[in-house]
Amino acid sequence: MSVADIKKQDIVKDNGRSANDTGSPEVQVALLTARINELQPHFKAHMKDHHSRRGLLRMVSRRRRLLDYLKSKDADRYTALVAKLGLRK
């Protein structure tokens, strides 16, 4: 199950610098966050699905690396993105 194309386009429009900007760290983090959030109910229902959990952990670590990169390059964009996506408590 993946993020639908229309939802993906909305995420790109909301977080990208332009409508076709799919490579910026903000867009990549937002897309990964959407995929991670979609998988949460699956893991609540299937707690022993370790094979898929490994993929989830891979997505989480990739998002973490992208956030670390963004924080090192531009801290203002990092804080804005974290606040927008609600990643930190």
Curated annotation (Swiss-Prot):
The keyword Transcription does not apply. SMART domains: Ribosomal_S15. One of its GO terms (cellular component) is cytosolic small ribosomal subunit. Residues 1-16 have a biased composition (Basic and acidic residues). It comes from the Bacteria. GO terms for biological process: translation. The keyword Ribonucleoprotein applies. Residues 1-24 are annotated as: Disordered. Keywords: Ribonucleoprotein, Ribosomal protein, RNA-binding, rRNA-binding. PROSITE patterns: RIBOSOMAL_S15. SUPFAM superfamilies: S15/NS1 RNA-binding domain (SSF47060). One of its GO terms (molecular function) is rRNA binding. InterPro entries: Ribosomal_uS15, Ribosomal_uS15_bac-type, uS15_NS1_RNA-bd_sf. Belongs to the universal ribosomal protein uS15 family. One of the primary rRNA binding proteins, it binds directly to 16S rRNA where it helps nucleate assembly of the platform of the 30S subunit by binding and bridging several RNA helices of the 16S rRNA. Part of the 30S ribosomal subunit. Forms a bridge to the 50S subunit in the 70S ribosome, contacting the 23S rRNA. HAMAP family: Ribosomal_uS15_B. This is Small ribosomal subunit protein uS15. It comes from Ralstonia pickettii (strain 12J).
